[in-house]
Structure formats: C-alpha cells, structure tokens
Regions:
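Catalytic phosphate/metal-binding cores of nucleic-acid and nucleotide-processing enzymes, i.e., regions
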Residues: 1-114
Length: 114
C-alpha cells in the first residue's frame, strides 16, 4: 500500500465520526502532518509513514507544535496505529470536560474502536 492510500483510509475513517473535518496534506506544504481533522472540537494532526520510515525533523517539529497547541498528534505506519492514536487521544481529551460532551466522545470511541 502506498503512503497516500493509507492516509486517505485514515482520513475517511476520521470523517466517519460524524461532525468531523478531515484534510489530507497536499504537496508543497513542507512538514505539515499528512492528515488533519477535528472531531467535536478536538484537533487531530497525524503523520503517516510506510513501515520502516519515520517523520523528518521538520515533521517532528510540526507535530510537537500542534501537540503544544492542544491537538491530538502522532505518527503511524499502519491504519491500526492511526486508530489507536486518535481514539486514545480522544479519550484523554474527554477527561475534565463537561459530562454531555464527554459522553459523546466516549460513545464515538466505543463505536469506532472495533
């Protein structure tokens, strides 16, 4: 599988959360994460790599910048790794927020963890 195909799969999975926004990076945007999204107001910025590869120093820097801004971040080599990053990040963000929104986030995670 090509990296772009894996990223599309991840982006469309994020879009399936409902009330989600996703974008796949376009060429020429140096260092920007491959997949960007927002689920229930929680920003997601993740980088996809083929197995055996890792992000460039610039990509690591951008991921850290987004993390400091409060986004769910990480990098993955498989679809399953991407799912774990997003679901674990959503669960972490659910702590300390109002109960109604927390219930929505946890319900989404339960639905998509399968």
């Amino acid at each position: 599988m090509k990296e772009v195909d894996m990223n599309k799969q991840v982006a469309y999975w994020i879009n399936g959360f409902g009330r989600a926004y996703k974008r796949i990076a376009t060429p020429g945007r140096v260092g920007e994460p491959d997949v960007s999204g927002c689920v229930l107001g929680i920003r997601i910025e993740i980088e996809g790599k083929l197995p055996g590869n890792k992000p460039t120093p610039m990509q690591f820097k951008k991921l850290e910048w987004w993390k400091q801004a409060g986004a769910i971040t990480g990098w993955y080599c498989t679809f399953r790794e991407a799912q774990e990053i997003v679901i674990n990040g959503l669960i972490q963000h659910a702590e300390g927020i109002d109960e109604k929104r927390k219930a929505k986030i946890l319900a989404i995670c339960k639905r998509f963890k399968k």
